[in-house]
Swiss-Prot record:
Record note on quaternary structure: Homotrimer in solution. May also exist in a dimeric or tetrameric form.
Gene, per the UniProt record: wbpA
Bilayer topology annotation: Single-pass membrane protein
Any GO BP: polysaccharide biosynthetic process
Protein name: UDP-N-acetyl-D-glucosamine 6-dehydrogenase
Keyword NAD in annotation: yes
Cofactor note: A monovalent cation. NH4(+) and K(+) are the most effective.
Pathway the protein acts in: Bacterial outer membrane biogenesis; LPS O-antigen biosynthesis
Required cofactor names: K(+); NH4(+)
């Protein structure tokens, strides 16, 4: 047993060693924030390549400047694959993936395997915080028994909290420090220690009554967005059939100063959270005999968008007297959103696969993704095509899937034979531009 005040004071005095487990789009910015305010930080990851790059002062995420990594390294940050060093840490913040399996059900293997790897090295006085997006009950059902397996009692010897990550890669308006941090603890003592951990690094910490409430908060945030995007994607289809520009309509509706929040249609949902989180809740709800029909319907609409874009591409080619089979198609933007290199759950990749499955010859251009990376479910041996007049002329059609600012939209409009615009970038009508 340890006095909770002693643990709290260690964080308030910034004498604690912060362990970040999982050094990706969530863990790396968090590491940089704690390092910047004077904490010693140890990064832990199973990926040797990532660890070696970080220890060499290099970065593998485009929107994080390499100079920041080099500065952190010079001021004491270290990365390792050695989980035995967990015992050195006063805080362990878990930032690992929570994807879906092939049945569209939660894949908790990363969380469970990581916690199992930590177990032998947990000790009195530590706080364990899970940040991965997950279903309500994960912290209590999966982490709690594992943390206590060696005899430590949560709330007395060791502290357990859930604080969902809210990173938005590439967003220039918000950073780790300025995004409020929701947190729930397994006990009041856990919450007290968790607040002490995060209030050093985050401007505003928002405590809630339990880890379940914190887990549900994250799901509500993202399901709210997914459902509203599903709504506007469905309205896009109706508006298109009626000859109405949905982007014009959304912009006009957004002038109402109350009761309306603008959401814009696109080729489908991307990123690690928005396309996945609804399935976490629908899966857990079934345990309680409930069916989340509204959420599931919006998911069906969003999942159908790549097929909708494909249909628009085929229509455009048919109008030009061509079939998709044998046509050369350039997909513009394969990251899941503009101005980043993050390809997690990108609908662009599904569009590429659909084009290929129909016999089209697919290529891509993305200034943020020079080479198609290794992905768990998708595989293309491709590099980004230069966006030049000569190159655009080689393709029978281009599909604007992600509207990066670095694209030359006037060049695309002038040189492409057919443009399928899934992002509403081209508002003025043109014979060779099809809105999708």
């Amino acid at each position: 047993m340890i006095d909770v005040n002693t643990v709290v004071e260690k964080f308030k005095s910034r004498q604690a060693l912060i362990g970040i487990v999982g050094l990706g789009y969530v863990g790396l910015p968090l590491m940089l924030r704690y390092n910047a305010i004077g904490f010693d930080v140890l990064g832990i990851d199973i990926d040797d390549v990532k660890v070696d790059k970080l220890n060499a002062g290099q970065c593998y995420i485009e929107h994080i400047p390499q100079a920041k990594i080099a500065k952190a390294r010079a001021s004491g940050f270290e990365a390792t694959t050695d989980f035995s060093r967990v015992s050195e840490c006063d805080a362990l913040i878990l930032c690992v993936p929570t994807p879906l399996n092939k049945y569209r059900e939660p894949d908790m293997s990363f969380v469970i395997n990581t916690t199992d790897a930590l177990k032998p090295y947990l000790r009195v006085g530590q706080v364990v915080s899970l940040e991965s997006t997950t279903y309500p009950g994960t912290t209590e059902e999966e982490l709690l028994p594992r943390v206590q397996e060696g005899g430590l009692v949560v709330g007395r010897d060791i502290y357990l909290v859930y604080s969902p990550e809210r990173e938005d890669p590439g967003n220039p308006n918000f950073e780790t420090r300025t995004i409020p941090k929701v947190i729930g603890g397994h006990t009041p003592q856990c919450l007290e220690v968790g607040i002490a951990l995060y209030e050093q690094a985050i401007d505003r910490v928002v405590p809630v009554s339990s880890t379940k409430a914190a887990e549900m908060t994250k799901l509500l945030e993202n399901i709210h967005r997914a459902v509203n995007i599903g709504l506007v994607n469905e309205m896009k289809i109706v508006a298109d059939r009626m000859g109405i520009d949905i982007f014009e309509v959304v912009d006009a509706a957004a002038t109402k100063p109350f009761g309306f929040t603008p959401y814009y249609p696109g080729p489908g949902l991307g990123g690690h959270c928005i396309p996945i989180d609804p399935f976490y809740l629908t899966w857990k709800a079934r345990e309680y005999g409930l069916h989340t029909r509204f959420i599931e319907l919006s998911g069906e609409v969003n999942q159908a968008m790549p097929e909708y874009v494909l249909g628009k591409l085929m229509d455009g080619l048919n109008e030009a007297g061509r079939a998709l089979k044998g046509s050369r198609v350039l997909v513009l933007g394969i990251a899941y959103k503009k101005n980043v290199d993050d390809m997690r759950e990108s609908p662009s990749v599904e569009i590429m696969e659909l084009i290929e499955a129909k016999g089209g010859m697919v290529a891509y251009s993305d200034p943020h993704v020079p080479v198609f990376p290794k992905m768990r479910e998708h595989h293309f041996e491709l590099s980004s095509e230069p966006l030049t007049a000569e190159n655009l002329a080689r393709f029978d059609a281009v599909v604007l899937a992600t509207d990066h600012d670095k694209f030359d939209y006037e060049l695309i409009k002038a040189e492409a034979k057919l443009v399928v615009d899934s992002r509403g970038k081209y508002r003025s009508p043109a014979a060779h531009i099809i809105k999708a």
